[in-house]
Amino acid sequence: MNLSQTAQFKKDMKRQLRQGKDQKKLIAVVEILLAGRPLPAKHKDHPLKGSWRGRQDCHIEPDWILIYRIKENELRLERTGSHSDLF
């Protein structure tokens, strides 16, 4: 599977790193997704609705979310941040 990141995701990630988030936690989740394996239940992976339809939401930490889309052979990282940052 190929990996891509939106420009907004890259900005979001810079903000998360400035806030002291551990990038290794995000990398571990992305590696599972790239391998095509389901995420452990603690990540609360679920589809989104409304304007986010077609995307998935999972928790890196309780208030650190990753929004992504898997389409064909591509994992696209679209947004990351807290609930208040994203919704």
Feature locations, PLM:
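Basic, Lys/Arg-enriched alpha-helical interface segments
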Residues: 1-62, 70-78, 84-87
